[in-house]
């Protein structure tokens, strides 16, 4: 039986799309199995998000790719619980943190993941074309970079130690990396816990107000099952509403998974009220 990688349909395109995702490229090159897990569309308890993964694990499962917070549903996976189950089977746990890095307080040791990646330009509010990679210290020697450049070393085994093993990528934009440090300093001034508290407050207020309008949500209202991503369920295509949201109300959202709002620390309650008013005005079109 072939080795397998477990992921979900709500992973980012880099992890789940049949065209261009890492697991599917590995499938084409090395013949691994890609197992897609389906989680409940409207979970009411953490266990409902853990069980589908545990049931998908087999003795041939080598890795599980988790999206911490989905940009398609807003669902927040209980990574620590899934990782604990994976660890008993020796399964590598990778976490896509694109929608959690910069939006909540994170302790990667508590999450229990082996690797974690995130882009800098989303909730972290940093530069584009930059991101972060975390590799558990005791796994550095076992993990190979997919691309190397001068500085790697003279043999197949790198001369570099620790994190520098993954930084041998040729010429790079050092100003971009300096901007990452500046952005990290800004987050430190506010405090990760305070950022997470404010994002939860804004997102919860927004979801509750939209639900009170009788407009269905894709995203769970319970903070423990969601993050800052708030997605409104749309009966038809979401792009016309996304364009109207910006043209008529000056609100930049996204059409992925429905009509997506992502309130952050720079938003105020007045902004939330304006978003709710926009949803109310577009309610007939949203409901179809």
Protein language model regions, located:
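Pyridoxal 5′-phosphate
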Residues: 1-4, 13-288
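Short linear motifs in intrinsically disordered, low-complexity N-terminal regions enriched in Ser/Thr
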Residues: 7-9
